[in-house]
Amino acid sequence: NSPKATTTKEYFSKEDIDDENIISFFDLTKEGVGFVFDLNFLGTLLPTQEFAKDMIGKKGCNILNISSMNAYTPLTKIPAYSGAKSAVSNLTQWLAVHFSKVGIRVNAIAPGFFSTNQNKALLCNKDGTPTARTNKIINATPMERFGEIDELIGATLFLISDNAASFITGVVLPIDGGF
């Protein structure tokens, strides 16, 4: 993500326009939003253009993209990321149809919440206790926990398997504990 594509608060109020310490929707920059779209959407489209050429007409070829549950349920503060991941999901479904006659399956995984080094500071206080954001996420997740990396791996292996998923294309698979 980019600080120039992220808002400070979950909800906008009219006083936010005059507060220089608050980044609102109106303060998002073209550069910040562009960075997020370039990283996520073009970071999916351009490699697909390059590598799919070699897959045409070959047995067992498939493309697996990485979307996000943000594509379905946008989180507060990160509109550019949610929009970019929606674009990845849409591209996945479009590519599935586009490549269907040349033997290339195209699917995506849509991870929900997983505790990683990248988001640890947002999820845990310095003393290791969960942040208010973590509690909100866990309370909104029916399975009441974060996902485990092995669960991402299992879903990935399923979708790329010619034995298990040879008739599956255009699917964006949620891996989210019911969130």
Predicted regions and their residues:
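Catalytic Tyr-X3-Lys loop
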Residues: 7-45, 64, 88, 143
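Active-site loop immediately N-terminal to the catalytic Tyr-X3-Lys motif
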Residues: 73-79, 101-102, 144
